């Protein structure tokens, strides 16, 4: 009996150690909670960031890389929308007059109800150049965007927009050609920045507006055109920027009722944060708008001239040639398919790159598992640099879609791809969950029905970012990158590994089903093998 009793005691020893260990762990958790409460409130886990250095703080995303991507066509929901990659930005955009349901309506945000037969980028390099074609019934618009960093430019450099308009039914009779109204606007999100009109007189100067921003410095916006155009302006003060179309349209309606003319009022609110310039004339006409940063008066004229007129034409042509050459280098289609197919390919990569947006805000997330009994709280303030699935219907970030987007984008510019992936992985919370739909900021929120706004921490999207990372690793093996690029990719993956592993663990523990199918096991083994490859890189 004593022998058997000793055996039982020895058998119970491991369990005793387990109980002792669990008791100690509970004690540590209780103590840590007390300590946390004494210092600061404990956040709900769903809105607690993953405890690791942000990928966006890596050196490869700083300095020249960060500045080179500062300005861009990062408002993909607009037919032409420009902003900077900063939470509070100077916004720029285009509206024009069109017909909708038999009445005059402003085109601004991409939407099928406008009835455009065509709109989209035909060339875009994702960095400093893009050309877009828009066909609105008889009106044909070509918009071009380009950046240029000159000596003396402020942070992010200077940029220019060219708008070319023509009447597709015009047969050369100028007196019968269509009279068209464009509305180019500037809107300042930062209350600490300035935005103003200084006595608009285009007969004496090309200056439209001026202002200052902390990192850009003093800036000016100039207009140049060889045609005779009428320019009018209005300045508003508003708290919201997602409804600028309504703001301008309501103002025009008042003007029509009071003065019987379709023309803004040439008045400016003393504290305006939105300036709208109505540019009107008979088609065809071309308008160049130049943003000059880091202004010093001695050099403004020279810099404006370099970004307008024949100089801008030359620069845009050079950028178009560079785009064509890079497209052939990346995809090599010239001798494989016909010329029409090449144009389709160029439009595909251009719309993918031109559909990249920058967003900042807070997601709405639920702390409760079942839908319908929501305790809704805000995620932490976050920025997101991402491609969007649709400029008209889904102009925001979708986790599932982004993996497929970046499968194409990395072949064009791996630095842009890593930047976007880093933004997404930095949205991970302490549990390894990433909200699958990112609705950040008022402009993004305005395009989403209320019932789809809240994100649930039990919901997942397929982890398609793993496909991109596997593809990039294959690209390294196939010598697709330079030694400098490989070094940056290695540094990125080395830092991203801990987040990717945690993300996989979250999937593997929260998304299990009742039945284990062969394809489910195959998916798990695929990701496990990829994580093993990344682990070996880290070793």
Question: Where are these predicted regions, by residue range?
Answer:
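Intrinsically disordered, low-complexity acidic Ser/Thr-rich regulatory segments
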Residues: 255-274, 377-383, 485-489, 539
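Intrinsically disordered, low-complexity coil segments
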Residues: 151-155, 168-176, 365-377, 447-448, ...
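Generic low-polarity alpha-helical segments
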Residues: 15, 289, 371-372, 500, ...
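Terminal accessory carbohydrate-recognition/targeting modules of carbohydrate-active enzymes
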Residues: 1-346, 353
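Intrinsically disordered regions, especially transient/low-confidence alpha-helical propensity segments
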Residues: 68, 93, 118, 156, ...
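Low-complexity, Ser/Thr/Pro/Gly-enriched N-terminal "stalk/linker" regions
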Residues: 304-394, 423, 514
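A generic structural signal for ordered alpha-helices
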Residues: 267, 330, 372, 376, ...
């Amino acid at each position: 009996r004593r022998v058997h009793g000793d055996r039982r005691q020895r058998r119970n020893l491991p369990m005793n150690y387990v109980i002792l260990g669990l008791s100690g762990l509970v004690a540590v958790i209780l103590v840590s909670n007390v300590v946390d409460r004494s210092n600061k409130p404990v956040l709900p886990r769903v809105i607690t960031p993953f405890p690791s250095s942000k990928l966006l703080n890596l050196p490869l995303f700083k300095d020249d890389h960060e500045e080179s991507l500062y300005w861009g066509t990062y408002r993909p929901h607009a037919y032409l929308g420009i902003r900077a990659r900063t939470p509070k930005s100077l916004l720029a955009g285009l509206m024009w007059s069109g017909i909708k349901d038999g009445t005059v309506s402003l085109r601004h945000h991409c939407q099928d109800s406008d009835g455009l037969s065509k709109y989209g980028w035909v060339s875009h390099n994702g960095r400093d150049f893009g050309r877009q074609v828009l066909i609105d019934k008889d009106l044909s618009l070509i918009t071009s965007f380009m950046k240029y960093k000159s000596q003396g430019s402020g942070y992010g450099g200077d940029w220019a927009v060219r708008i070319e308009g023509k009447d597709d039914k015009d047969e050369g009779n100028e007196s019968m050609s269509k009279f068209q109204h464009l509305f180019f606007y500037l809107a300042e999100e930062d209350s600490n920045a300035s935005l103003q009109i200084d006595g608009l007189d285009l007969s004496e100067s090309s200056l439209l507006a001026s202002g200052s921003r902390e990192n850009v410095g003093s800036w000016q916006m100039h207009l140049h055109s060889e045609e005779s155009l009428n320019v009018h302006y209005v300045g508003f003060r508003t708290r919201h920027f997602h409804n600028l179309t309504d703001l301008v349209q309501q103002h025009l309606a008042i003007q029509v009722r009071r003065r019987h003319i379709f023309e803004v009022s040439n008045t400016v609110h003393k504290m305006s944060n939105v300036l709208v310039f109505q540019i009107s004339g008979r088609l065809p006409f071309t308008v160049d708008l130049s943003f000059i940063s880091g202004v010093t008066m001695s050099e403004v004229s020279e810099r404006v001239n370099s970004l307008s007129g024949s100089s801008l034409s030359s620069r845009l042509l050079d950028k178009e040639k560079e785009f064509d050459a890079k497209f052939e280098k990346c995809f090599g289609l010239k001798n494989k398919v016909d010329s029409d197919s090449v144009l389709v390919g160029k439009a595909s990569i251009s719309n993918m790159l031109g559909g990249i947006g920058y967003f900042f805000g807070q997601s709405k997330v639920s702390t409760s598992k079942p839908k319908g009994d929501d305790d809704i709280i805000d995620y932490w303030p976050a920025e997101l640099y991402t491609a969007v699935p649709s400029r008209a219907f889904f102009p925001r970030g979708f986790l599932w879609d982004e993996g497929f987007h970046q499968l194409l984008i990395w072949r064009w510019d791996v630095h842009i791809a890593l930047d976007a992936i880093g933004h997404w992985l930095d949205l991970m919370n302490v549990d390894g969950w990433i909200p699958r739909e990112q609705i950040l900021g008022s402009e993004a929120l305005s395009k989403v029905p209320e019932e789809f706004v809240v994100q649930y921490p039990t919901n997942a999207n397929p982890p398609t970012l793993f496909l991109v990372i596997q593809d990039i690793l294959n690209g390294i093996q196939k010598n697709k990158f330079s030694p400098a690029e490989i070094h940056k990719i290695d540094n990125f993956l080395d830092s991203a590994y801990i987040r990717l592993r945690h993300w996989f663990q979250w999937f593997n523990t929260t998304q299990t089903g009742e039945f284990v199918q062969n394809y489910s096991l195959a998916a798990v083994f695929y990701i496990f093998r990829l994580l093993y490859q990344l682990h070996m890189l880290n070793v």
